[in-house]
Regions:
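Conserved SF2 helicase motif VI
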Residues: 154-176
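SF2 helicase motor core recognition
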Residues: 18, 129-147, 163-168
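A conserved SF2-helicase RecA2
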Residues: 11-21, 168-198
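Conserved interdomain linker/interface between the two RecA-like ATPase lobes of SF2 helicase motors
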Residues: 4-81
């Protein structure tokens, strides 16, 4: 995504120089405890995230923030991706968003007719895609304006791949909203977030 600047600029420098879209960063702080989630050498163990993170109160908090702060004005016109921990999480987030009156669709390896879903997203019939690893790399949609980081990760590579989905700068998009969902991690290694990177 950084073109010829990849080896020369940090993400912060690239934003300051206008190579990529600037990130307007928001934090949703939860009381979820990650200190007991195991680490497999690269990232959190997904089975542990399933037990600790995929809880209704956390999901509802994310939906309420989107409903309260991202449905009006410029933010209300933006489409987004919610990065989830697994397929079950994508389905639950999509269900909660639709119940709240925000059009959403789960998007994973289980999705029937994924091309149709993506076309409807590009036609603005769907506002949020709730996705897991399927959309982290190799996908580009320049109009993407909101990234919700609902999957805790210790992998800077994965985090930057996901962030990269929304950093394409266009003639009409100068910035992207990044919403970091920040859980408690105690004395353990801090999960990746925009604040941690910068």
């Amino acid at each position: 995504i950084f073109g010829n600047y990849t080896t020369e600029l940090s993400l912060k420098d690239a934003m300051e120089k206008g190579v990529v879209a600037r990130a307007n960063v928001y934090r949703i702080e939860t009381n979820i405890d990650l200190s007991h989630v195991r680490f497999n050498g690269k990232d959190y163990v997904n089975a542990d995230l399933e037990k600790s993170v995929r809880v209704t109160s956390r999901n509802e908090l994310i939906v309420n923030v989107l409903k309260d702060y991202f449905t009006e004005g410029d933010a209300g016109k933006r489409q987004g991706i919610i990065f989830c921990i697994n397929k079950a999480h994508t389905k639950e987030m999509a269900r909660l968003l639709n119940t709240a009156g925000i059009s959403a669709q789960d998007y994973s390896g289980d999705t029937k007719h994924p091309e149709k879903v993506m076309q409807e997203f590009k036609e603005h019939k769907i506002r949020f895609l709730c996705a897991c690893d399927m959309i982290s790399e190799g996908w580009d949609y320049p109009e993407l304006g909101i990234l919700v980081m609902a999957r805790p990760t210790l992998s800077k590579v994965l985090y930057l791949q996901q962030i990269g989905r929304g950093l394409r700068r266009t003639s009409i998009k100068k910035n992207v909203f990044v919403i970091d969902v920040v859980d408690e991690y105690g004395a353990m290694v801090r999960p990746c977030s925009m604040h941690a990177i910068f």
